[in-house]
Design a protein with these regions (language model features):
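Ribonuclease/tRNase effector modules and their secretory precursors
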Residues: 1-83
Length: 83
């Protein structure tokens, strides 16, 4: 998987893969969150990318990302709220 937004390969942690299965998030949806979702940065390399999918009932989907030489997906959340 490759992120056009960050121009890097995407690596999904085992934890994030488990959460994706539990929450019914496909690789395609995850890439859409990463590439076209809104972003909030904690610092230069840590961020939350999030996006609403109208067909889903669980509010925003969010991917917790670390930007290294690749985009590392640490976890995937649903029912995400932006404060």
């Amino acid at each position: 998987m490759f992120s056009q937004r960050f121009q890097r390969l995407v690596v999904i942690s085992n934890h994030a893969k488990i959460r994706m299965v539990e929450r019914g998030v496909s690789a395609e949806m995850l890439l859409e969150v990463i590439d076209s979702g809104d972003a909030r940065y904690k610092d230069a390399t840590h961020l939350w990318a999030f996006k609403a999918f109208p067909e889903r009932y669980d509010n925003l989907l969010c991917a917790v990302l670390v930007l290294e030489d690749r985009v590392v997906v640490k976890t995937v959340m649903h029912h995400f709220l932006v404060l």
